[in-house]
């Protein structure tokens, strides 16, 4: 059971790091809450164009 919790924690950390690195390379303007950022990454994969509170636009 401990290994399952460890895997879940690792997945959350990796997802958060991925979303942060994705938005720093995209150059997102404005404040994008981490919860919104994760939703945008899930929706657009790596093609996020705009991430603002309540606004998520995919490029392409």
From Swiss-Prot:
One of its GO terms (molecular function) is potassium channel regulator activity. Keywords: Disulfide bond, Ion channel impairing toxin, Neurotoxin, Potassium channel impairing toxin, Secreted, Signal, Toxin, Voltage-gated potassium channel impairing toxin. The keyword Nucleotidyltransferase does not apply. Disulfide bonds join 32-51, 40-56, 44-58. It is found in: Secreted. Residues 1-28 form the signal peptide. Its main location: secreted. Expressed by the venom gland. It comes from the Eukaryota. GO terms for cellular component: extracellular region. Weakly inhibits the Kv1.3/KCNA3 channel (1 uM of the toxin inhibits currents by 13.2%) and Kv7.1/KCNQ1 channel (10 uM of the toxin inhibits currents by 27.7%). Has the structural arrangement of an alpha-helix connected to antiparallel beta-sheets by disulfide bonds (CS-alpha/beta). Belongs to the short scorpion toxin superfamily. Potassium channel inhibitor family. Alpha-KTx 29 subfamily. This is Potassium channel toxin alpha-KTx 29.1. It comes from Lychas mucronatus.
């Amino acid at each position: 059971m401990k290994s399952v919790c460890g895997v879940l924690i690792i997945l959350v950390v990796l997802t958060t790091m991925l979303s942060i690195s994705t938005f720093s390379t995209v150059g997102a303007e404005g404040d994008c809450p981490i919860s919104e950022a994760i939703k945008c990454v899930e929706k657009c994969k790596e093609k996020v164009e705009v991430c603002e509170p309540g606004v998520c636009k995919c490029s392409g």
